[in-house]
UniProtKB/Swiss-Prot annotation:
Lineage of the organism: Bacteria, Pseudomonadati, Pseudomonadota, Betaproteobacteria, Burkholderiales
Pyruvic acid (Ser) modifications at: S182
Cofactor(s) needed by this chain: pyruvate
Family: Belongs to the phosphatidylserine decarboxylase family. PSD-A subfamily.
Protein source organism: Burkholderia pseudomallei (strain K96243)
Active site: S182 (schiff-base intermediate with substrate)
Entry protein name: Phosphatidylserine decarboxylase proenzyme
């Protein structure tokens, strides 16, 4: 599959460069015995910013998982960004997960809203309403509305979003990044059927999160 992004995310290049320079300088001055923790840190930073290509399911009504991580919520909830009752599915990313976000569906971006907030543990339910977050509301060609919300966490304090209202999105398309541990909430139309359960490990784009109903 042709993936139009480097396998090490561009968002991490400055951090990797800094970690490499520090490790090299300390190694040059004090040898490996002194520098090994910094080499270990470099390895950690490189693995954190990995961004591998993924197989993308082609099932027509499938909603794909927007992020790597673990399912922490599957529930009926109010979607405050599209003002409706919805099926809410939440994915928590720890520091060892890939942290790019990918579109769960094909569609057009209806709006993008950023909200400043706190930096609570993203695994907590209240993080959805209280933490810094960025919501992307997407309308599919069939008329379904899907909301994906990037949420900052205890360590993650930098949400990056690369789409604007009116732009098209393809399922599996990379549209954002959150640095160092975070959460993504997905709100789906009532009648959608969840294909995941709480505690399940999921992968961005390759895991089917839910199935949309036949009619919007």
């Amino acid at each position: 599959m042709n993936y139009p992004h480097p396998i090490i995310a561009r968002e991490g290049w400055p951090f990797i460069a800094i970690a490499a320079v520090v490790a090299l300088l300390i190694h040059a001055v004090g040898g490996f015995g002194l520098a090994w923790p910094f080499w270990l840190l470099l390895v950690f930073v490189v693995q954190f910013f990995r961004d591998p290509p993924r197989a993308i399911p082609t099932q027509a009504n499938a909603v794909l998982c927007p992020a790597d991580g673990r399912i922490v919520a599957v529930e009926t909830a109010h979607d405050p960004y599209a003002d409706r009752e919805a099926l809410k599915i939440s994915v928590f990313m720890n520091v060892f997960n890939v942290h790019s976000q990918r579109s769960p569906v094909d569609g057009a971006v209806q709006k993008v809203e950023y909200f400043p907030g706190a930096f609570l543990n993203a695994a907590l339910d209240k993080a959805s309403a209280e933490n810094e977050r960025n919501a992307v509301v997407i309308q599919t060609g069939a008329g379904h509305t899907v909301t994906a919300v990037q949420i900052a966490g205890l360590v993650a304090r930098r949400i990056l979003c690369y789409v604007r209202a009116g732009e098209p999105l393809s399922r599996g398309q990379r549209y954002g990044f959150i640095r160092f541990g975070s959460r993504v909430d997905v709100y789906l139309p009532k009648g959608s059927r969840a294909r995941v359960s709480i505690g399940e490990k999921v992968s961005a784009s390759s895991t089917i999160l839910a199935e949309l109903p036949e009619q919007p």
